[in-house]
Amino acid sequence: DRWPRIFTLSNYKTVLHQQNILTGAVVSVARTVLGTIFSLVTNALLAYIISRKRFLFRSQLSLFWVITMYVNGGMIPTLVLYRNMNLTNSFWVYVIPGMVSAFNVLVMRTFMEGLPSALEESAMIDGANDFTIFTRIISPLCKPVYATVALFVAVGQWNSWFDAMLY
């Protein structure tokens, strides 16, 4: 009596024919994919800038990133900011605020600081600019940290249901 008598998929049919379920699934997947891609790009660029020893305000900017990990603006000021930016009731409220994460920037920066500076110096001697050095030398070597941060961001985006209720 614990097992169903007739095997049926009618419950799946009922659920999948509801438009709001499909819309929610599409939004969740799009949010996770776009949020992960945008976050990887912005965090990697910021981490590269901070990891370069010749960057003028390197230590001050790193300190700023660490402080933002511990001090939060609060829920109400965040909501007011999102309203002023016209992000509420928009898909982009899920993607734009998560584009930069202090923790992920510091993880990437630490990884990039571990790469030999001779790679960058030899590319400069060959005439490469900073963007070329980043895209052709540093970025391919950072695939392990990109994968790690991508998992952090994707799981965080997928599991973040509270902001969908708020904004």
For every predicted segment, state its role.
Residues D1-Y167:
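A hydrophobic, multi-pass inner-membrane permease signature
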